[in-house]
Amino acid sequence: MKYSVRYNRSLDLESFDEIIIELKDEKYEDLLGFFNRYSDKRIVIKIDDCSNFLEENKIELFKQLEEENPEFNYTFLLKKYDLDKKTEVIQLLYDNDFSYYVEDFISDEEEMWNAIRTGYSDVIITDSLCFYLEDIAPILHSYGINVRVFPNICQRKFLHGNDIKSFFIRAEDVKIYEPYVDIFEFWGEDNQQEAYKNIYSKSKQWVGPLNQYIIGFKEEVEGHHILPTFGERRLGCGRSCLKGGRCRLCDAYIQLSSTLKKNDLVLINEEMDAIQSKSEFINIDWYFWKNII
C-alpha cells in the first residue's frame, strides 16, 4: 500500500510515498529543486486553473523537465469542478504523452469506464463502487490505472444512511485491501494526514470507537470488537443488502461487537477465539499531538 499526502511543510513528507502539490507560479528551477529533493516519491501536480495553465503555456516547463529528467515520476491532477478549458488541457497532456487524472469521485461502472476511455492514470473509487473492488480492481490494473480510495471517511450519499453499511476501511483491514487498492489518500485537515497515516501504516489498529478516526461515522462502535473477517466480506459484496438481498452480515457484526464489548472481549481470528480486552479509548486529537508534535 502506498500513502499520499497533500503538501504541508509541517509534516514528515519523507514518510509518504506520494506528494500532491498545487501548481501556481513556480519557475523551472523551483520545480526542478522540488523534484530533486523528493526524487524517490511520486509527485501529483494539481492544476487549479486550466485557463491559466494554457495562457501561461506551462506545458513547456514540463516538456523541458521531462526531456532533461525522464527519471522523475509524476502525474497531473485536474480539479473536479474546473470545467473551463479542462478538456483542452486533457488533450494537451495526452498529445504530449503526460499522464493525468481528474479529481472525479468514481462511484459507478459507467464513470469507471469513462475514466478508462479518457486515459486516466488514477481513479478515485468511492461510495457503492468500493464494494466491488474485488471485481473492478483487476480491470483497472489491466489498463495500468492506480486505484485510490479515502479509507478514513464514512461514505454515503445521504446523511440518514447506515454507517456500518457505508464504505470505510478499518486500520485492521489494510492488508485485506492491499491487492486491490494502490493508494490511500486521507480525508480531513491537512495537518492530521500524518496521524491518519500512522494509524493505518504503523499501528494498524485502533483501540476505541470507529468515530474517533473514521470521519462521519456517528455510531459508538469499537473497531477492535468487530470480527476480523469484516473487511474481507465487504470487498466484493456489491452491497447486496441494499438491493433486496438477504445479507445482514454488517448488522450481525455490530450485534456481536456489542456483546463482546459488554464482556470486555476481543475476537482474534475466524475460529472465534477471544481474549480479554485491555482497551483504553484514544482520541484522534490526542493521538495527533502525541505522535506528530
Regions found by a protein language model. Give the residues of each.
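Active-site pocket-lining/capping segments in soluble small-molecule metabolic enzymes
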Residues: 1-111, 118-293
